[in-house]
């Protein structure tokens, strides 16, 4: 049985780099989408280097978002909707401390999609 593809949508405005060592690539089709803006902490070379130990370059996507109240959240939810429309059987994990995602993600799980939020704390 094939492993389910996992897609990680990273809210860098509030998750910084705490998630880096906690996500894993289970299939060659897994994907990491990093959303960043001027409000995000800088993405350092060391972070990219750690990512490349687990994910290939083709598994990584960087999405610049525009500043504004909840702007990055809306970009993430928009991209999630686009991805679910193309690959409804994939597992989607929003990495964020922001609980504002939860009602939409709950609604998606009620419709049979695998869509969750997880957050990591500084160690």
Label every PLM stretch briefly.
Residues 24-29:
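Short, conserved loop/helix-junction motifs that constitute active-site signature segments
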């Amino acid at each position: 049985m094939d492993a389910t593809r996992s897609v990680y949508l990273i809210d860098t405005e509030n998750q910084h780099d705490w998630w880096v060592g906690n996500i894993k690539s289970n299939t060659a089709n897994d994907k990491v989408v990093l959303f960043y803006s001027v409000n995000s902490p800088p993405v350092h070379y060391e972070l990219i280097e750690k990512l490349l130990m687990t994910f290939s370059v083709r598994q990584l996507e960087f999405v610049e978002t525009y500043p504004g109240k909840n702007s990055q959240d809306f970009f993430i939810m928009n991209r999630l909707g686009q991805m679910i429309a193309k690959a409804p059987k994939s597992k989607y994990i929003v990495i964020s401390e922001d609980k504002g995602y939860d009602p939409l993600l709950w609604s998606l799980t009620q419709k049979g999609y695998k869509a969750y939020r997880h957050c990591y704390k500084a160690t």
